[in-house]
Amino acid sequence: MRWPDDIDEVLDADVVVALAYRTPAGGVVISGVSPIGLRDRDAGTVGFTTSLGFGRKLERIRRNPQVALAFHAREHGRSRRADYVLVQGTVSEVLRPGEAYLRQEIGKRSERYLGAPRRGLFWDRWLRVYYRDRVLVTVQVERIVRWPRLDGGGEPEVIGSPLPEGGLRQSPPKQGTGPRIESRRAERRLGTVPHRLLGFVQADGLPMVVAITITAADGRGLTVRTAGPVLPAGGLRAGVLGHKFYEQVAGLTSRQYTGWLTVDAEDASTGIYAPHTERNLVIPHSKTIALLLNGLAATTTYRAAQKAGRERLLDRS
């Protein structure tokens, strides 16, 4: 599958995109990743890198490789286009590249988006695992959906297989569908970040990710709205990501939620989202602090990955 030049510009430009992957129960988790422009139009693939230490993410992708990447944020990037571009597909490869490829290909690409690596005796030791312990994930693109506005407004253009109707049919969780986290607290936290995204599984099994605004919070959950009628009628598991990031990702805020979305059949642009779990990460706006924390996290998670034997999740190079 091949996409046009204007979409390719967006795929090359964004510093941070939202990765949506499925949970075993049929929900969606959304997290930020840096694609560093990895793509191949001739092969119809888009890629991103992550850490071997993030084994839970890799395990879930291995179990169900249907994913989506939402190119939704232009700040600090290389394009001023207003398009919201959603790439949907199936992970075809999870590979730990050799050191030469990491240095020559991934390293050079990373510098364009994330800046030159810190050098010196301390930094070489502290960031050794962070720079070496990278996993390359390749997604075979099945569909691209492009909206003309970053808020998801306007008539969508679909490249590839047609969009299915509705979401994946699901049974409600045994613990009930109502909020398990105080809704007003979630509203306040999500109100501190500029980007808010909602993800759910479509009827064809691929995650859909849409931009949302939050207009209210009460005992039922968060009232979420989209710029167009894209929400599936009924109830299903869904994930929310609220985030912001600074230039070269020298600091970020991430608010992740999983929960239950309920949508009335009469209004496909409004839903009630009941948050069930949350995960918050704040890294101050400082390149030095960000690298210190990244180095610590990479070393810690890599040791955990070795202990858990997560190398089995990787393809052979």
Question: Language model features by range: what are they?
Answer:
Residues 36-77, 213-249:
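A short mixed-secondary-structure module that forms the rim of ligand-binding clefts
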Residues 1-18, 166-197:
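Short, basic/aromatic recognition patches
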Residues 11-23, 67-71, 194-201, 239-241:
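A short, Trp-centered hydrophobic/proline-enriched beta-strand micro-motif
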Residues 78-185, 225-317:
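Charged, gly/pro-rich active-site loop segments
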Residues 19, 33-35:
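GNAT/GCN5-related N-acetyltransferase fold signature
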